[in-house]
């Protein structure tokens, strides 16, 4: 074989290999479509306590085509829609071939009342803002979907932490509106025990700071930063994970120093309303109304919803066919924050969605 023919043969092999490689790789990167922003405004919104507010705005982002089955995604406290687009959550769920592939589903992620670009106390009313709760937030979501977007049915509702609690409320308040429910990092039982005590202390530590001044401050009260970090360390992060990353005195001090030095963009009044809105949460009375499949996902190291209480097992007896996935604790999990990392339950979520009744 001549040198020329050898080179030609090598070139053909390279071309064939390249062709096969291109055929095996999608033409588009494995990323979901870019989010589209929108807002719905209620000319007049009445809250659970009779208070009203004109022009309540609920901001949202969507992924995918409106003609596809709709999925409602609900974020946690102190978050906004953007948190659900993170690489650990949305990056594991909304891309091509993933459980909630945005080329097959219409993903809707609202900012809850009081956060993000939705109407909130810091827009101007401060401490005179209506006292909203989770029921109000769910009502606003329902009206946004039905009145603002013309959506009368959902394929799935999936929510994390506060969003998980609101998913439970959705199931009992609007039974059958969604084909399936996936409440995560939550329990349907009333807000109580350490979960509420820590939230109450979080709110009180700011309200009792003279710098808060009944909500009429000109600079953020110093207590806001301290209260936020205390709450996060106490109710999030995971015992094994903290032992791995802060297992020495020096490492623990370094982590505290970093958190205290980090920029804080929160507003104290918004913060108080966000955490206080959970005070009267209790989805238990609506459990018997839930007739659709439920996949509840919690973690074994969840500081706010410890599985050893048996509360979830007892509650799920009220929901025929409900499944409970408890993610085992490890140095890789993050306590209450574990469910923000979808890699821990992608397989189970995929199976659950595939098993939903056909429509």
Segments (PLM) and residue ranges:
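Conserved hydrolase catalytic core segment
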Residues: 153-192
């Amino acid at each position: 074989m001549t040198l020329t023919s050898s080179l030609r043969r090598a070139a053909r092999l390279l071309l064939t290999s390249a062709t096969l490689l291109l055929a095996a790789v999608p033409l588009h990167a494995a990323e979901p479509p870019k989010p589209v922003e929108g807002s719905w405004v209620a000319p007049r919104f009445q809250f659970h306590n009779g208070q009203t507010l004109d022009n309540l705005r609920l901001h949202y982002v969507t992924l995918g085509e409106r003609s596809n089955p709709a999925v409602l995604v609900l974020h946690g406290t102190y978050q906004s829609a953007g948190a659900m687009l993170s690489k650990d959550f949305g990056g594991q769920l909304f891309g091509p071939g993933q459980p909630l592939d945005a080329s097959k589903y219409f993903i809707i992620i609202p900012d809850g009342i009081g956060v993000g670009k939705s109407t909130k106390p810091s827009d101007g009313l401060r401490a005179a803002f209506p006292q909203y709760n989770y029921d109000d937030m769910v009502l606003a979501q329902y009206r946004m979907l039905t009145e603002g977007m013309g959506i009368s049915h959902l394929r799935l509702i999936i929510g994390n932490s506060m969003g998980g609690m609101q998913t439970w409320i959705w199931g009992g308040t609007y039974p059958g509106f969604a084909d399936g429910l996936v409440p995560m990092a939550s329990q349907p039982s009333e807000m109580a025990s350490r979960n509420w005590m820590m939230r109450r202390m979080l709110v009180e530590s700011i309200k009792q700071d003279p710098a808060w001044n009944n909500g009429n401050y000109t600079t953020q009260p110093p207590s806001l930063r301290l209260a936020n970090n205390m709450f996060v360390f106490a109710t999030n992060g995971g015992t094994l994970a903290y032992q791995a990353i802060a297992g020495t005195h020096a490492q623990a001090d370094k982590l505290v120093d970093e958190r205290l030095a980090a920029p804080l963009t929160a507003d104290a009044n918004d913060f108080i309303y966000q955490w206080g809105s959970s005070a009267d949460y209790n989805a238990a009375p609506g459990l018997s109304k839930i007739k659709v499949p439920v996949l509840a996902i919690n973690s074994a190291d969840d500081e706010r919803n410890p599985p050893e209480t048996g509360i979830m097992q007892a509650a799920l007896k009220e929901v025929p066919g409900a499944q409970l996935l408890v993610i085992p604790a490890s140095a890789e999990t993050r306590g209450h924050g574990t469910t923000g990392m979808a890699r821990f339950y992608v397989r189970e979520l995929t199976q659950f969605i595939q098993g939903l009744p056909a429509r």
